[in-house]
């Protein structure tokens, strides 16, 4: 009877230990590996040839862009800063001196800036990246003690949306002389992505052996690089000396009218 009691005690402890291990393993979240293989470069080199310098100054306002929620704040800031730098480079390449205005609002021009600026360039818009609903699928992990991975997945194609509007202003009056808009949804940019997140439940035993992959951040950076290059290419075509000098008569009339 004593031997049988020891056997039962051992079996009970073994069962308890096994249950504890299972509980411990079930409580572990699966590991997600986020790839970091793409750099956010936002590069562009003006395609137009450098032209003869003019004795004219253009005021360049800071871009007033809004971004979709999946674009990180640091990417937003770099996109905005690089836009300012590259548009400045494009205008300088067209023979203009550029005065950077630390505001996106034309009402913040100083009187001196209004007086010396031939034109002003303002930019606003929405930079949006979204999954293509026709080519994106979602798979949620089902709860379970054994075979639940504990990982939810979204796999598909990231595409751009939104717009960028560029307005040419006469600084003294604040009047718009011209504008052009780029529809980002028309860009042929498609980035495959896999976004993996932890499920609302912890997953089963198999989740301890599963490693999830998430390359969605790389897809965002790659798409932003291409969007940026496309925007700058259009800027390069529109902000030429020939086009900008065509506003000279109207700009002069508006400035003189304001000075009266």
UniProtKB/Swiss-Prot annotation:
Signal peptide segment: 1-27
Major site of localization recorded for this protein: membrane
Domain of life: Bacteria
UniProt keyword list: Cell outer membrane, Lipoprotein, Membrane, Palmitate, Signal
Positions where lipid (S-diacylglycerol cysteine) attaches: 28
Gene3D superfamilies: Putative neuraminyllactose-binding hemagglutinin homolog like domain (3.30.160.180)
Localization terms from the record: Cell outer membrane
Topology with respect to the bilayer: Lipid-anchor
Pfam families the record matches: NLBH
Lipid attachment site numbers (N-palmitoyl cysteine): 28
GO cellular component: cell outer membrane
Protein's UniProt keywords contain Cytoplasm: no
Protein name according to UniProt: Neuraminyllactose-binding hemagglutinin
Protein species of origin: Helicobacter pylori (strain J99 / ATCC 700824) (Campylobacter pylori J99)
């Amino acid at each position: 009877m004593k031997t049988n009691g020891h056997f039962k005690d051992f079996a009970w402890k073994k069962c308890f230990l096994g249950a504890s291990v299972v509980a411990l393993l079930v409580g572990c979240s699966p590991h997600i590996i986020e790839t970091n293989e793409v750099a956010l470069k936002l590069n562009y080199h003006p395609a137009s040839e450098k032209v003869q310098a003019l004795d004219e100054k253009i005021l360049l306002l800071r871009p007033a862009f809004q971004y979709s929620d999946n674009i990180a704040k640091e990417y937003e800031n770099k996109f905005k800063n690089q836009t300012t730098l590259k548009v400045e480079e494009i205008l300088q390449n067209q023979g203009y001196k550029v005065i950077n205005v630390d505001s996106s609002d034309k009402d913040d021009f100083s009187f001196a800036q209004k007086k010396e600026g031939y034109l002003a360039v303002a930019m606003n818009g929405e930079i949006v990246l979204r999954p293509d609903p026709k080519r994106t699928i979602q798979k949620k992990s089902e709860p379970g003690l054994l075979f639940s991975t504990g990982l939810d997945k979204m796999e598909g194609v990231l595409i751009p949306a939104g717009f960028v509007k560029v307005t040419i202003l006469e600084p003294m009056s604040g009047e718009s002389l011209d504008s052009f808009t780029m529809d980002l949804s028309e860009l042929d940019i498609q980035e495959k992505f896999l976004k993996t997140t932890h499920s609302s439940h912890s997953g089963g035993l198999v989740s301890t052996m599963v490693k999830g992959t998430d390359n969605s951040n790389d897809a965002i950076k790659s798409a932003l690089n291409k969007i940026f290059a496309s925007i700058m290419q259009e800027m390069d075509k529109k902000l030429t000396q020939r086009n900008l000098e065509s506003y000279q008569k109207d700009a002069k009339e508006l400035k003189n009218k304001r000075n009266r």
